[in-house]
Amino acid sequence: MKNDRDTLEFEANANKYSWVWKKATEKSRYRLFEKITSLFQEINLELQYTGIKFSINTEYSPEYLKEAASKYVEIWQLDETTFVAGKGHRKSVQQRHYEKLKEYLSKLNDYVEKIQICGDGRNSYSKTDHSATFMRIKKDYMGNDQLLPAYNVQVGVADEYIAVVDVNQYRSDMDCFIPLMNKFHDIYGFYPKYPVADAGYGSYNNYIFCEQNGLEKYMKFPMFKKETTDRNYHEYPF
């Protein structure tokens, strides 16, 4: 059975300036880890005469910070209702340290949540639509190369009929090929024999998938045209 596929990027109904970038969030989290380490070093210096010491690591979990904040309150018998604020009030060392612990805990929870929403398969999402991923769509009505929140919609056609449709969060068509083939298999109980697709789908992982599941490899790889028709490339490949 011959199965052709193409992709469409549908812009999501989300604010196009509401992006969250996974890599930027991870960098911010590691900078926060450094601040937490510095804070624990200060607290350990403060508590050295008590024999109590908080463990210092390269990474921290929200649970550990929450436990540390509770322990710190217990050690100093802190009462938040007595905390001072505003001009003319000098905060105690204990109040400053405790407030920093709470601040860092809040930030760390925020970073962890953002990274979990992104998941392993994508690097961004929209604050107003967590299912949408920022990608370049084929037709940008703004006439520019701006990244927009969208969904990658895959359509498989067999004998001029739409056989399967799949909606993904992946920016690359390469990553959408295997989920689409598996969805086809779930519906019909077999894989299409001839999965015809353009070079955007050709990758080592997809070829291996075809080999393992009895599909003919009808997708060109991204450099196919250059490697087969470009004379300069053959003479100077590097």
PLM ranges: what are they?
Residues 1-238:
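Anion-binding and metal-coordination hotspots
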